[in-house]
């Protein structure tokens, strides 16, 4: 009985500690893929009508374009105009380049006063923004205004980099038809998950699926076939090993 009482007391203590932690830091960090290193902190950074973006001069045109697209999507869904600032300040998103970091790595510091993104390359900035978007309300991925949402992100320090250089998805349109909008949606989902390669299986013996006006017979002839050719009878087994297999009967 004493052991049981001790066990119940321990369970009660654990539940109490978990409850206290939840009250101190109610933030949720639902990220895919989960970062390599993250320190969760209390508080939130709130986007308001005065929030601006400062892009360090060494970032270059590509990073400016990436931030412009983010600001456009944010304005469409949150109804807040994220203007580009000429210098850093409070309640800002600050983007900097650090060439000592690995190619696709990023560092994200979110405090109550600002969001700092540091990366070595434009791709690192992209992945940092994808993390920010995952921390925002899901409405950020929509097409309509959702001004009533809580447009804020939980405070945290995140250091992240991909484990694999090739992170891809295979899309077979030779056997399965997809519209252009469906392909774009797949690319958007890939971006959310920080994938970097689309293996687009455009053609196969089933047909040619890409119309090229200069070569019309590719689709006139190559887009259809009467049958699938198979070899029904195999002969001349020589039982000789080849490529790890015998050229005899293989089941």
Task: Explain the meaning of each model-derived region.
Residues 1-30:
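Bacterial Sec-dependent N-terminal signal peptides
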């Amino acid at each position: 009985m004493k052991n049981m009482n001790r066990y119940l007391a321990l369970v009660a203590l654990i539940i109490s500690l978990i409850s206290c932690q939840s009250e101190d830091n109610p933030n949720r960090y639902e990220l895919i893929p989960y970062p390599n290193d993250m320190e969760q902190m209390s508080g939130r950074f709130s986007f308001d009508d005065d929030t601006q973006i400062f892009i360090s001069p060494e970032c270059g045109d590509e990073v400016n374009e990436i931030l412009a697209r983010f600001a456009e999507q944010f304005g469409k869904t949150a109804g807040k105009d994220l203007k580009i600032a000429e210098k850093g300040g409070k309640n800002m998103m600050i983007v900097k380049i650090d060439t000592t970091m690995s190619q696709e790595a990023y560092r994200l510091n979110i405090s109550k006063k600002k969001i700092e993104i540091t990366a070595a390359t434009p791709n690192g900035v992209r992945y940092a923004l994808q993390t920010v978007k995952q921390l925002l309300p899901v409405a950020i991925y929509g097409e309509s205004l959702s001004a009533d949402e809580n447009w804020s992100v939980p405070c945290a320090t995140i250091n992240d980099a991909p484990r694999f250089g090739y992170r891809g998805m295979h899309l077979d349109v030779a056997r399965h038809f997809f519209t252009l909008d469906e392909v774009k949606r797949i690319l958007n989902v890939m971006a959310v998950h920080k994938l970097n390669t689309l293996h687009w299986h455009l053609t196969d013996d089933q047909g040619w699926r890409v119309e090229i006006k200069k070569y019309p017979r590719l689709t006139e002839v190559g887009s259809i076939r009467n049958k699938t050719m198979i070899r029904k009878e195999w002969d001349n087994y020589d039982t000789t090993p080849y490529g790890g297999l015998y050229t005899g009967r293989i089941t």
